A protein has these predicted regions:
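Pre-Walker A (pre-P-loop) alpha-helix and adjacent loop at the N terminus of AAA/AAA+ ATPase modules
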Residues: 3-45, 224
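C-terminal engagement/docking regions of AAA+ P-loop ATPases
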Residues: 232-314
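P-loop (Walker A) phosphate-binding loop of NTP-binding proteins
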Residues: 42, 76, 144
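AAA+/P-loop NTPase substrate/partner-engagement loops
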Residues: 57-85
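Walker B catalytic acidic pair
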Residues: 41, 104-105, 116
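Canonical AAA+ ATPase core
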Residues: 83-88, 109, 121-198, 203-213, ...
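Conserved alpha-helical scaffold flanking the Walker A/P-loop in AAA+ ATPase domains
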Residues: 25-29, 82-102
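Walker A/P-loop
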Residues: 31-68
Length: 314
């Protein structure tokens, strides 16, 4: 069942997101692994459309927050207001009470407002005036930021960055893919015509199935060697945390599930390592050239020998 549902989701989103097969697979990996996504790319590359396409495909409630410097934490979480008719305080839910939340241009809001998302992302709950309210599963945050604009922005703190399972960019379209996009959007509105292919209950079942994906003991040691290497590398000031190790684990399990397997293979590590680990590294000043973190992760993967086994064996 899992294979059919995930294949239907991939095909449905691809009706709108032309030429982004890898990104679609990684977004679905985050969804089944219960992880959040940071999409960093220039405007107009389809970040918002990706989030909306996913929400429509899984029959999920979609919420969007346009982050600005004057946005308040209560604009994210909601607030209590006094109802004159009833003479009582009433809670008004904020846009974070949804299944898929698009946090657009998250780095334009102040750190105080950014941190209001932290409890939502980490604990999947919201506390306002001492009252804690759980968020409905599935709950996925897709945050976006523009890497080219830094004026008037507030860089995400490390604690917030560590809460994102993956940091992704949209894929550049080939001439053939761009031609296909023009032809499709010339006479159609693919996003408006997109319909749901699975209910939220099936997504919750996929998230449970992700935890059961088999990881061979040799691959457990392979994972450990990768994260340990980030802590002793001379180019890295601060390596992957234990939370990052567990995120890496869930990501490889999720990617295996998206690929139609109930067991992890070494290729899963190679596919998700950079999106999962690079944004968790603090580089030495002398080594940071913009892509240094990605390059170091790739070097580590190339340096560590791949174990060879029958990965599906129990």
């Amino acid at each position: 069942m899992e294979n059919n549902v995930l294949q239907q989701l991939k095909e449905n989103i691809a009706k709108v997101m032309i030429g982004n097969e890898r990104t679609i697979e990684l977004v679905l990996t985050c969804l089944v692994a219960k992880g959040h996504i940071l999409l960093e790319d220039v405007p107009g590359t389809g970040k918002t459309v990706m989030a909306k396409s996913l929400a429509k495909s899984v029959e999920a409630e979609f919420g969007r927050i346009q982050f600005t410097p004057d946005l308040l934490p209560s604009d994210v979480t909601g607030l209590n207001y006094f109802d004159a008719k009833s003479g009582e305080f009433v809670f008004s839910k904020g846009p974070a009470f949804c299944n898929i939340l698009l946090a657009d241009e998250i780095n334009r809001a102040t750190p105080k407002t950014q941190s209001s998302l932290l409890e939502c992302m980490a604990e999947r709950q919201i506390t306002v005036d001492g009252v804690t309210r759980p968020l409905e599963e599935p709950f996925l945050v897709i945050a976006t930021q523009n890497p080219l604009e830094t004026l008037g922005t507030f860089p995400l703190p490390e604690a917030q960055m560590d809460r994102f399972l993956m940091k992704l960019s949209m894929e550049a379209l080939s001439p053939a893919e761009e031609t296909q996009m023009i032809a499709r959007f010339l006479t159609e509105e693919p996003l408006a015509e997109l319909s749901s292919v699975c209910p939220k209950e099936e997504i919750r079942a996929l998230q449970e199935a992700c935890k059961e994906v088999y990881l061979h003991p040799e691959l457990v040691q392979y994972l450990v060697r990768i994260v340990q290497e980030t802590r002793v590398n001379s180019k890295i000031a601060s390596g992957v945390s234990p939370r990052g190790t567990l995120a890496f684990l869930r990501a490889v399990q999720g990617h295996a599930l998206v690929q139609g397997r109930n067991y992890v293979v070494p290729e899963d590590f190679k596919t998700v390592a950079v999106p999962v680990l690079a944004h968790r590294l603090t580089m030495q000043i002398s080594a940071d050239d913009g892509r240094a973190a990605e390059s170091v992760i790739e070097e580590i993967l190339n340096r560590i020998d791949l174990p060879t086994e029958n990965w599906s064996g129990r």
